[in-house]
Design a protein with these regions (language model features):
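Active-site rim/adjacent substrate-binding subdomains
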Residues: 1-135, 140-174
Length: 174
């Protein structure tokens, strides 16, 4: 397993739509293993393939706490079949929008159809934080970031901060 570089906003690569996976083969399994390793190292609770420069419809999620046994979920070609009308708000962050957090409201539950790590079709009824995380990661597959749900002002402030952080990092590296 390899830890890969996570792309950060305002990288235009993050804004593209991801392509469906034709079949879950060894290449896709290696991708999922690398994504999981990258997510744990960051650390984070969810990651979409596009965030590491692979525009495929693959996401990984693990909501287990540090002291708990790992419980990774793998979603290939996820598709939301149903969302609740009731919303829930969580303070969201994102590995591609480092050190920035904001309250985002999303449907509290969702039903998702997907292929698992072994390519088997599954359906999951998710609620609460898991539902929010699935929807957040699936947004990445459409080129959408959580900051797109914020006011123009809040979004522009965050993007300016990220650009400044990036420039400062480049100065340090060079």
């Amino acid at each position: 397993m390899t830890i890969r570089k996570i792309l950060t906003e305002p990288d235009p690569f993050l804004r593209q739509k991801s392509k469906p996976v034709e079949q879950v083969d060894d290449e896709i399994k290696t991708l999922m293993d690398d994504m999981l390793e990258t997510m744990y190292a960051a650390p984070g609770i969810g990651l979409a393939a596009v965030q590491i420069g692979v525009p495929k419809r693959v996401i990984v999620i693990d909501l287990s706490k540090d002291n708990e046994k790992k419980n990774p979920l793998f979603f290939v070609n996820p598709e939301i079949l149903k969302k609740s009308e009731e919303d829930a708000s969580y303070e969201e962050g994102c590995l591609s929008v480092p050190n920035q957090f904001a309250e985002v409201s999303r449907p509290d539950t969702c039903k998702v159809k997907y292929l698992d790590y072994d390519g088997k079709e599954k359906i999951l009824d998710a609620k609460g934080l898991l539902a929010t995380c699935i929807q957040h990661e699936m947004d990445h597959l459409e080129g959408i970031l959580f900051i797109d749900y914020l006011s123009k002002l809040k979004k522009s402030i965050i993007i300016k901060k990220l650009s400044k952080q990036k420039k400062n990092l480049e100065r340090i590296v060079v």
